[in-house]
Regions:
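Donor nucleotide-activated moiety binding/catalytic core segment of transferases
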Residues: 378-386, 446-449
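A conserved acidic, glycine/proline-rich C-terminal tail/linker
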Residues: 439-453
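Electrostatic interaction modules used in gene-expression and signaling proteins
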Residues: 453-455, 463
């Protein structure tokens, strides 16, 4: 294998076990045999004297108050979630209720197990910068106890030249709050089609819904279904399927006084219950202006599903499922603009080949056209993308990952035609970045992996995960990278070399 073309920076990000959030803790419900102990615990707290209750609560605030935003509000919320278990909830004092909430809470270190798979986009705030500087937002895959992944962020400034400064990531974290979202009827239609749900109950609901609707409208339409339809054998099952499909779209928002690095996108639906993995962010631009888009993998402990998110400011995020044969595997990367009026994405629907998929008029990603299959020795097991294509004068620059002997991951590159991205113009025969002695050891050894790079002033900046142990940064000049590529054979030449018809 040839040596890496990219140059590593000295700056790295490592997992910080002090980055914690508060989660609901219900004793007994995490055991092999589920039997809640909530009522007994609340009864024991209620029997504490006023002095002991006050002392315990003060001690808890002293120990944990500086580590979290609005600790009292969280305790109130967790008490409200279990108050129905209290024998005489009205008899509990405000202090006792807060203490009950504390007993039903625990800290979770979001990145204690691993920190990896970053992507990089221009930050929404470009104020107070010097000449040649660009502030960037770096998305991070954070992995904590139980191998649950969430999406975090860091902020950095790149330039001039190859200078890099990463902002401090300290301060209490926030997981955001679910907020109202305007659901799209066409996405519900696509989701039901994906699950082959086409009966009179579903058709009646879809006919009654407007193009955009809120949760109250959705539930009102369900409540007004004729009894004759609900009494059919498929009635209740279809209602459950409608609610499950609709719940896949949601929105979450963070307080305005939180910094980007304090925001954590935490799993919020059953499909995401075991993690939100490998977010690939891109700044998408069309006639309505710029917006941040990303794809990520939702994991429920058994199966995966591809999700998309959109945000105008990286403070409010809307999540929706992605549908269609082009979206049935991990690692979808969106193009930063439409090409010929088409929304395009890179994918790997077959598990080993990079393909190009198009969004159709029914909001389904079509079956992909193959772009690049394993060919070089360092990528013979499988290939995939390392983030969204980057537009250059020479074409669409695509970073790839390939898997070689001993499941060693390295990063390569392709160049696609700017106007016909289904055509590969050139490829890098060697590696752009491969694990060195400093990168090879970690939770998942022998891996370098990126979910998205960025070009600034002629330099390609590649954030990368190193064996899930840390996040590093590497750079290479775009002209140097392009000059190291070799021209791809034309389709006719490739056919002749394979001994095709003729």
């Amino acid at each position: 294998m040839t040596r890496s073309l990219a140059v590593r920076q000295d700056v790295t990000l490592t997992p910080d076990p002090r980055r914690v959030i508060i989660k609901l803790f219900v004793p007994g419900e995490d055991a092999a045999v589920v039997r809640t102990r909530a009522r007994a615990l609340i009864d024991r707290v209620a029997r504490l004297g006023d002095e002991e209750t006050g002392r315990l609560l003060r001690d808890t605030f002293d120990r944990f108050g500086a580590r979290h935003r609005d600790l009292a509000g969280t305790f109130h919320h967790h008490y409200d979630l279990v108050r129905h278990r209290a024998a005489r909830a009205r008899d509990l004092s405000p202090t006792s209720r807060l203490l009950v909430g504390a007993y039903f809470s625990h800290e979770y270190a979001v990145e204690a197990a691993a920190l990896c798979n970053p992507s990089m986009v221009a930050h929404p705030d470009q104020t107070e910068l010097g000449t040649g500087q660009l502030r960037v937002a770096v998305s991070l895959r954070q992995v904590g106890e139980g191998h649950v992944s969430s999406i975090g962020f860091a902020t950095a400034v790149i330039g001039p030249g190859r200078q890099l400064t990463v902002a401090d990531r300290s301060g209490p974290l926030a997981v955001g709050q679910r907020v109202g979202v305007r659901h799209r009827r066409d996405l519900l239609v696509a989701g039901l089609a994906e699950e082959d749900c086409d009966n009179e109950v579903a058709a009646t609901v879809l006919d009654a819904l407007p193009e955009l609707y809120d949760e109250a409208t959705f539930e009102r339409v369900l409540a007004n279904l004729p009894p004759d339809l609900l009494s059919r054998s498929t009635g209740l099952g279809t209602l459950e399927q409608l609610r499950r499909t609709n719940a896949g779209s949601y929105a979450t928002a963070f307080p305005t006084d939180t910094a980007l690095h304090q925001r954590v996108l935490w799993p919020a639906t059953p499909a995401e219950s075991n993690g939100m993995e490998d977010a690939r962010f891109v700044r998408f631009v069309d006639d309505s202006g710029p917006v941040y888009r990303a794809t990520y993998t939702a994991y429920d402990g058994r199966s995966i599903a591809t999700r998309a998110l959109v945000s105008s400011d990286l403070r409010r995020f809307e999540m929706t499922p992605m549908r269609g044969p082009g979206a049935r595997n991990k690692g979808i990367a969106l193009f930063p603009r439409t090409v010929g009026g088409r929304h395009l994405a890179l994918c790997r629907a077959d598990g080993e080949t990079i393909g190009l998929t198009t969004l159709d008029s029914d909001n389904r990603w079509q079956a992909p056209a193959p772009l690049h299959a394993p060919g070089e020795s360092w990528e013979l097991i499988q290939v995939g993308n390392c983030g969204s294509p980057i537009e250059t004068d020479a074409g669409w620059l695509v970073l790839t990952h390939g898997v070689g002997p001993m499941r060693r991951y390295a990063i390569g590159a392709l160049l696609l035609d700017l106007h016909r991205p289904e055509r590969v113009v050139a490829h890098l025969p060697g590696v752009l970045l491969a694990p060195d002695e400093n990168d090879r050891d970690g939770y998942v050894p022998n891996v370098v992996y990126s979910c998205g790079a960025l070009v600034h002033d002629g330099e390609l900046w590649v954030p990368y995960g190193a064996s899930d142990a840390r996040v590093g940064f590497a750079t290479v000049s775009v002209p140097a990278l392009l000059s190291a590529m070799v021209q791809a054979p034309s389709p006719a030449t490739a056919t002749d070399e394979r001994g095709g018809a003729g």
